[in-house]
């Protein structure tokens, strides 16, 4: 299936000069959505990724991470923006183009030595994925890979990620 044909391009969003890759058109297509999850799971099996948990980055990582965890027989753990989780958290601050941001995960969600796959809809510069990886490693977990639906290759996000398998289904 041609996933690119299910992803809508929106020029000048959210600001002039940006070409936004809109996945809502992929999500509404029942065959495309099923294929996306099945294909991502297949790539994880092919890479022999033995995982305990899929971590989904807020918020579109939740959309793909939860069904992927189900397909892989793993648990799902959300990584959220600061202040969104009700219990005690591990947190990490990271640099953005114009400031900083913070990611959090519940303290009781991950245990040291857990094997983790990080999933999101898209990798651009790699900042959020890299911060999530550092958070996982701070806790003492083993990062076994990343899974992305879309990779914007020109932004070279993967060069900021640890040396583990990186799966991307569609490249621009």
Swiss-Prot record:
Residue spans making up a coiled coil are none
Give any Gene Ontology cellular component: cytoplasm
Q: What is its EC number?
A: 2.4.2.7
Extract one GO BP annotation from the record: purine ribonucleoside salvage
Signal sequence: where? Answer: none
> According to its UniProt record, what is one Pfam family this protein matches?
Pribosyltran
- One Gene Ontology MF term: adenine binding
Q: Which domain of life is it from?
A: Bacteria
According to its UniProt record, in which pathway does this protein act?
Answer: Purine metabolism; AMP biosynthesis via salvage pathway; AMP from adenine: step 1/1
Q: Which reaction does it catalyse?
A: AMP + diphosphate = 5-phospho-alpha-D-ribose 1-diphosphate + adenine
What is the stated purpose of this protein?
Catalyzes a salvage reaction resulting in the formation of AMP, that is energically less costly than de novo synthesis.
What does the subunit comment say?
A: Homodimer.
Q: Which family does it belong to?
A: Belongs to the purine/pyrimidine phosphoribosyltransferase family.
- What this protein is called in its record is Adenine phosphoribosyltransferase
